[in-house]
């Protein structure tokens, strides 16, 4: 007896007008995640996942490419306005914001959410090379 064909429903993408771009810029890599206002991730990209390995991963150009790839991933949601939250001291902070602006998003505000300790944990000892 023949199996009945399995019907798959086409996933309908919800339309989101405003989004939040979370940029985590470390010294070694840059991670860009675009979420809706509630924090549900819509798309993400990293400099390492964009084809950059080793020391090239920690360049501003790699962060720019990661931001462009993330922007392409969330275009189908219809996002027009972005709020950017930048975390970390890495070299990809500025270039990520420029790339998101060039991708056609209107950036409403930029917030620095880098965690700063109020004299918390003891930092690691200094390197002696």
Curated annotation (Swiss-Prot):
The keyword Ribonucleoprotein applies. Signal peptide: none annotated. InterPro entries: Ribosomal_uS11 (IPR001971), Ribosomal_uS11_bac-type (IPR019981), Ribosomal_uS11_CS (IPR018102), Ribosomal_uS11_sf (IPR036967). Pfam families: Ribosomal_S11. Keywords: Ribonucleoprotein, Ribosomal protein, RNA-binding, rRNA-binding. PANTHER family: 40S RIBOSOMAL PROTEIN S14/30S RIBOSOMAL PROTEIN S11 (PTHR11759). This is Small ribosomal subunit protein uS11.
């Amino acid at each position: 007896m023949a199996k009945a064909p399995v019907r798959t429903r086409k996933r309908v993408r919800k339309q989101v007008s405003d989004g939040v771009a979370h940029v985590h810029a470390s010294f070694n890599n840059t991670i860009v995640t675009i979420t809706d206002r509630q924090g549900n991730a819509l798309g993400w990209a990293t400099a390492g996942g964009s084809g950059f390995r080793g020391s090239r991963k920690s360049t501003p150009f790699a962060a720019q490419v990661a931001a462009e790839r993330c922007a392409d991933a969330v275009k189908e949601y219809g996002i027009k306005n972005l709020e950017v939250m930048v975390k970390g001291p890495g070299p990809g902070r500025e270039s990520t914001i420029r790339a998101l602006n060039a991708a056609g998003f209107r950036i409403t505000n930029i917030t620095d959410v880098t965690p700063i300790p109020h004299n918390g944990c003891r930092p690691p000892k200094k390197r002696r090379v």
